[in-house]
Amino acid sequence: MSVYQTREGLPSGWVAQWDAEYGTYFYVNESAQNPQPQWEPPVENLKLAPPPGATSVNTAVYNNNNNTSAANTNAAYNANTAANANANTATTTNAAATTSAAYNPNAPANTNAAYYPNAAATTTTNADGSDKGLFSGLTSSNGYTTGNSYSRPSYVAPVAAGLGGLALGGLASHALGNLFHHRGHNGGGFGGFGGGSGGPPPGPGGFGGFGGFGGEGHHHGGHGGFGGGPGGFEGGPGGFGGGPGGFGGGLGGFGGGPGGFGGGPGGHGGPGW
């Protein structure tokens, strides 16, 4: 199966491959010892034009919105133009009687040339003379079709991400709980730090994992987790509070991990005795 790839605007050794299902590119560092595909471009704010005949997801949304706006705008414009046709004709007739020569005797016959002397050199047209249109601001892909393709990047499912963070939190809580217990019986362990990453852009990603649970201590409960891992739209929640202690519960979690649109909530404090 042939795929579309390009190296336009990428560092040496990198290649971008078009994913027709998601309507976007993913990127591979072919110079790495173990090349791994990724959705994030290696260059910040890189904008590649889609392959010929293809449409990106964001562009499709843009076109639909603007087609609707254009239809409404043109209808209103045409109605106003028809209503004012006579007035415009009268104004144009009077304007023709007053020539520009009275103000600028040396004005060229083609006034556009005076204001836009380099218009011909800067016109954004294709080889056939047609306007480049919507993608004129994007980097030309200058790509090629090849049979040497890569598989799209995989990502951790949301449920698996949450369970993974919770498991990591439990392990960290147990290990650090033993450490603090042997240093003066002052508390249980800390929660976990883990969580899954988001899915491919521009769609939603997975949710971050949970922070760990705090352990029990002799004089003070353990602290809650330090938050879940990052997610596409929301980080995982913080730990669920410290375990009970001799003289007071541990602190709650210190906040969820970062997300595309907001971190998760913090944890809740444990009970005191």
UniProtKB/Swiss-Prot annotation:
Pfam families: WW. It comes from the Eukaryota. Residues 191-273 are annotated as: Disordered. Residues 8-44 form the WW domain. SUPFAM superfamilies: WW domain. One of its GO terms (cellular component) is nucleus. InterPro entries: WW_dom, WW_dom_sf. Residues 205-215, 223-273 have a biased composition (Gly residues). This is WW domain-containing protein C660.06. It comes from Schizosaccharomyces pombe (strain 972 / ATCC 24843).
